[in-house]
Amino acid sequence: MRTPELTRRRMISGTGLVAAASLTGLASRAIGQTAELKPSVPPPPIGRAERLARVAKAQRLMRANGIGAILIEPGASLDYFTGVQWWRSERLTAAVIPATGEPIMITPFFERPSVAESLGIPAEIRTWNEDEEPLKLVADFLRERRLTRLPVGMEETNRFFIPDRLKQQLAGARIVSANPIVRGCRMIKTAAEIALMQAASDITIAAFRHAWPQVRAGMSASDIDAMIGAATRALGGGYDGGLVLVGEATAYPHGSKKPHVVERGSNVLFDCGCSVHGYQSDISRSFVWGADATPEQRRVWEQVAAGQKIAMVAARVGRPAGSVDDAVRAAYTRWGYGPGYKLPGLSHRTGHGIGMEIHEPINLVHGETTRLAPGMCFSNEPGIYLPGKFGIRLEDCFHMTAAGPRWFSTPPASIDLPV
């Protein structure tokens, strides 16, 4: 459940980037021990040939759906298709991929060298100056390619000014969802993508194994997150912060603003991941520190572990994604939780899509009718939360194959051996 809205998560949980001086001495010493960790050798990054195949697939899907072109703003999809890693601002940089022919990049004149440096596919770069309208370049391109009578696809995260100003430049322009195109490509991971996600998962598990035995009484969530982050970076993963919850905060999926420190019998939750060449991991582990788990803690932990297994049995190619969530929730209801999303119980979806982004379509959630297919990747995190007491979340990701789901990380054996 490692949420991509990093600032929001830190605001809620009270966990943030912390200076070394603000860490406890125990945490600082533990971070110093990461020197013994050696970075792994990752698989190669996504190359030109794979990106060209992605563009070709997108074009086939556009033609099948009667779409003339798609406009891709900065973000994971722009990186996915072009290799350009950029940011969103009032100055438009975007790719326009037509249903046939070579794509173009639109960018400010002064940004051209930087865009050209990272562009990973053949594409003409068209520039605009500060006193010019960038959407005119898009309109002109559509006219040149004789695509003005076909709709233009845009992602649902595109900002309003883009379609609005395109319509001003191209009378009668029709804007439709690019979901059938972009999701049709990004939801199905290739072997190269799965290898990068496997590498990211391996790093996160190794970081957990390094950090778990070094948790000490008096440590804060920020202390523990800093330990995990230092280990992750030492092992070669990109890390921009995780979610660590302690005590009663574990009863709330994204934590609480109340400060908590580790003490004997504390319920502790790690929810962290990393990136390898742009691909993500997302893993959660729950355990009791410094004491044997109570019968209630052990029972809930084992029920969540059973929930993960139920999800894996339900995840079969051709079944609706929502059926996985339904299977877990039905079992939890039989065990006295819920019903549905009510508490105590499972108040969030069973899982989310994952790839270049921590959260991607589609989700393992009630009502999702998209059929599971080989290459789809998901988290499996059917946590159980007891408000005012504690919560248990175990999270491991998996990818679909024709023979069934396959784990990226192996679930833990018990609450006593959580990593």
Regions found by a protein language model. Name each.
Residues 2-6, 10-419:
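Active-site neighborhoods and metal-handling regions in enzymes and metal-associated proteins
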